[in-house]
Amino acid sequence: MSYQVLARKWRPKTFDDMVGQSHVLKALSNALDQNRLHHAYLFTGTRGVGKTTLARILAKCLNCEQGVSSKPCGKCNSCIAVDEGRFVDLIEVDAASRTGVDDTRDLLENVAYAPTIGRYKVYLIDEVHMFSKSSFAAILKTLEEPPLHVKFVFATTENKKIPPTVLSRCLQFNLNHLSADQINKQIEMILNAENTVYDKPSIELIARSAAGSMRDALTLLDQAIAHGNGTLRESEVRMLLGTIDSEDLNGLIQSLINSDPEKLLNIIETIALKNPDYDALLAELL
């Protein structure tokens, strides 16, 4: 069996699997359980915080054969099809590659038709801010009065580029950056489940370097494990990230505290030989 990258293997399949975003999960769960369903949702936030994943889970919640619920069964044909990316009534569109008005009109032509197998036909439009003005104008009427069997879910990193007329027709949810601690705990859980040998400082380095993005963290984790030949060690992670080791860092801080310019210059020369990432170095000093 071919290797599956960690970001895909550990993609959340339920709301309970999600890391962070409790304010969004609570609102969506209550709406689903009370059957107070809106026709259009907009998820905003930086890269890798769970926008597309959340949209797919929402599609599963809406189409589970056991009924609309915040806790889909995960075992019926619809749930399995969503998880495997083959649910025909979940139409995923990358707006960045379909910016033209003709593309949007082609998409909307099928809106009137009933779902093939599911309860709802869900249109997931990723990076929706990439739509042209004409595309937004074309979708506006359908977005205002869509058929009862249609739900729109938009995801974007730049909601300021979306026209107010579109924003006003959507329920908007802003997904926050994840904290280093949240990322740290998720990485540790994954490493334990994967039976990967690691040390905790290496996890902390990756969690800080991810800048609030779980996807970036897991991509770095994949790289670091490959770099370390199946293990995760602080020295290997520092080499990968271009950061300096703790001994040099402590020496740098101590020479500053002691106002020792000669020692400071010597340490800086030693660090320079390693071609570090100076932005990362300053971040560690802070």
Predicted features along the sequence, with ranges:
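P-loop/Walker A NTP-binding region and its immediately flanking N-terminal helices
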Residues: 1-172, 182
